[in-house]
Amino acid sequence: MCSVARHMESIMLFTLLGLCVGLAAGTEAAVVKDFDVNKFLGFWYEIALASKMGAYGLAHKEEKMGAMVVELKENLLALTTTYYNEGHCVLEKVAATQVDGSAKYKVTRISGEKEVVVVATDYMTYTVIDITSLVAGAVHRAMKLYSRSLDNNGEALNNFQKIALKHGFSETDIHILKHDLTCVNALQSGQI
């Protein structure tokens, strides 16, 4: 009887371990299958954001649009972004290295690392990016919607809302950025 009980304990332990591994895997962001980095390159407008970062998220209700230029340099993804922060436009240039699949990248900065995952894109009109970063010892997530154009983004915004809700953000976490191109124009003209 004792060996039967041990055998049953072993089976239950492995079953629980398998269940835990399955649940942990289910929490990761979906990644675009067959991601084509060459189609992803170019200019993107940042038009919406989902964030649970408290004051950071609240500040975005009145924020101006940002932008991102994606280039390939020496086998690294070179990202030049501009965004509005505390009353002025900020320019950030970083390199991203590919991790665990073609649509997942790691960005290393002085302030820490970010994991950037392309979770949805059609390459021609929109892309949704899930960003995980370590801020003051805590893990924070944000999701951003980028568009190739400023026109006819209704469907992209609806898709973004569905994706953000599916990834654990609430409707109050989702913010459409103000149609103010101050930072975008500064990036395009090189004035930042």
From Swiss-Prot:
Secreted listed as a keyword: yes
A GO MF label: retinoid binding
One GO CC term on file: extracellular space
Keyword entries, A-Z: Disulfide bond, Secreted, Signal, Transport
One biological process term in Gene Ontology: retinoic acid metabolic process
Predominant place of localization: secreted
Name of protein: Epididymal-specific lipocalin-5
Organism: Mus musculus (Mouse)
Gene: Lcn5
